[in-house]
Amino acid sequence: MIRVVSIVLALVWGEAVYAQAPAAPVVQPRVYANMLQLMRGTLYPQSNVIFTAQVEDPAAFKPAAHQSTSSDPFTSAYGGWEAVENSGMAMAETANLLLVPRQCSNGKPAPVQNADWKMWIDELREAAVGVYKAGQAKNDDVVLEAADKLATACLHCHAKYRNVPGGNVNRC
């Protein structure tokens, strides 16, 4: 009986100690770029891959003489349709970065907590996955559909947060 009571007390004490342990602090990633820099450095070049694939067959690009240093995704070591796939995944991952608190180019906080911002980031992520699937499909119709969804996702957010009256003062 004493043994059973000792075991029960040890378990209760262990639970009490575990329950009182402080939660590990949530660490926010360090931010280096404002929203404009993030967009221009990541989404702009990656979206141009799918927009180029609308008018030029990714498989028709000739590999660059120095593929490992080519700045053109289509002629690089990971060119052709793989460039379309990679741009889709890069944009989907970048969508996560658009939710990290940071500054707009005008110094104001980016609206990352706004419901519409979050909704449009989800739309961007979904469109980016569509770009990835278009690269896998290697099909012009799928590319056109993916490019349209991506352009629409960008337009929704840009209409409110980029192309605004008052210029840079009011934009993110």
Residue map of PLM features:
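Extracytoplasmic c-type cytochrome modules immediately beyond a signal peptide or single-pass transmembrane anchor
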Residues: 20-149, 163-172
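Bacterial N-terminal signal peptides
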Residues: 3-16
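The canonical Cys-X-X-Cys-His
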Residues: 150-161
